[in-house]
A protein has these predicted regions:
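Bacterial Sec-dependent N-terminal signal peptides
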Residues: 1-22
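Active-site beta->alpha N-cap acidic-glycine motif
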Residues: 20-88, 115-117, 124-131, 224, ...
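C-terminal domain-boundary segment and adjacent tail
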Residues: 20-21, 66, 119, 151-160, ...
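Structural recognition of the beta-strand scaffold that forms the well-ordered cores
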Residues: 29-33, 56-60, 88-93, 125-131, ...
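Short, solvent-exposed loop/turn segments at secondary-structure junctions
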Residues: 37-39, 63-65, 94-96, 134-136, ...
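Catalytic domains of cell-wall/extracellular-matrix polysaccharide-remodeling enzymes
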Residues: 41-44, 49, 70, 98-185, ...
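Acidic/histidine-rich helix-loop elements
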Residues: 60-73, 98-104, 207-210
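Charged helix-capping and loop-helix junction motifs
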Residues: 71-77, 106-110, 211-217
Length: 261
């Protein structure tokens, strides 16, 4: 009996690996995500991503109260153009709502507004979500499951481990103009089956300077990733590596881990 238990403990990580991973996670795998739909994501970010041939996911919302100000935020035609450029458009709620304070009906309304807007513009069905302000709770995960979302991104300033992190609690680092050393150090953690995900706001961010990433710093990150031969993808492309249904089945959501930035 003791020998069987020892054998099971030795084999369990291999079994888990085989069930959750469709393909091995390569070292130097990075996901770039962009929140809140500031105007600079269209004018600065998208052209630079194209220049470097990098993927990315844009989590869009209508950030109240100034979302209609084209000097601050993208309009829906620009968001449509991001999709046409080959980038993923994903859901960040209608009004940048704290989903931990919403009923299921309220949450569904927030999600459906963005879904319907995208559908009207020919943008493919949205499958991924990011928690505005990193506000979340266990109910939010249940609501996302009911709506058939695949991945949901939080914060936490740590690498994503598909063998231990629930697909609705994917951690990320957030960039700003002060944490260059932290972000460069974070890239080093993209190894041994772990994936580094960045949350980026405006480049620059005029309305929310505390999450501002200067364009020259953003380009420096892209250059670092290119020179050091990182693979840079969207959230959606994680499905090439991860069996999400198995990950949901095998991982209980762990709210004791850090989930905000």
């Amino acid at each position: 009996m003791k020998n069987r238990l020892t054998l099971y403990l030795l084999l369990f990580p291999l079994i888990l690996h085989a069930q959750i991973l469709k393909n091995p996670i390569p070292d130097k795998l990075v996901v770039l995500t962009f929140d809140d739909a500031p105007a600079s994501q269209y004018s600065v970010v998208a052209p630079l991503l194209q220049e470097y041939d990098f993927g990315g996911t844009f989590f869009v919302c209508e950030f109240q109260p100034n979302y209609a100000d084209s000097a601050l935020y993208m309009n829906w035609r620009q968001i449509q153009e991001l999709d046409r450029m080959g980038f993923e458009v994903a859901n960040h709620t209608h009004t940048h709502a704290n989903v931990s304070k919403l009923s299921q009906a309220e949450f569904n309304k927030q999600l459906s507004y963005i879904e319907d807007k995208c559908d009207s513009l020919g943008i493919p069905k949205l499958t991924n979500f990011a928690y505005p302000g990193y506000g979340l709770n266990s109910q939010a995960l249940e609501f996302l499951e009911a709506k058939d979302y695949v991945f949901a991104r939080a914060g936490g300033s740590r690498a994503y481990d598909p063998l231990s992190d629930h697909p609705y609690l994917i951690p990320s680092w957030a960039t700003d103009e002060t944490n260059k050393a932290e972000i460069l150090s974070a890239f080093d953690q993209a190894k041994d089956g772990k994936i580094v995900i960045l949350t980026i706001h405006g480049v620059p961010d005029i309305e929310h300077p505390w999450v501002n990433t200067p364009p020259e710093l953003f380009k420096e990150y892209l250059e670092y990733l290119k020179v050091n031969e990182f693979t840079v993808i969207s959230m959606k492309e994680l499905e090439e590596y991860i069996d999400v249904d198995e990950a949901k089945r095998l991982h209980k959501p762990d709210f004791s881990k850090k989930l905000s930035n």
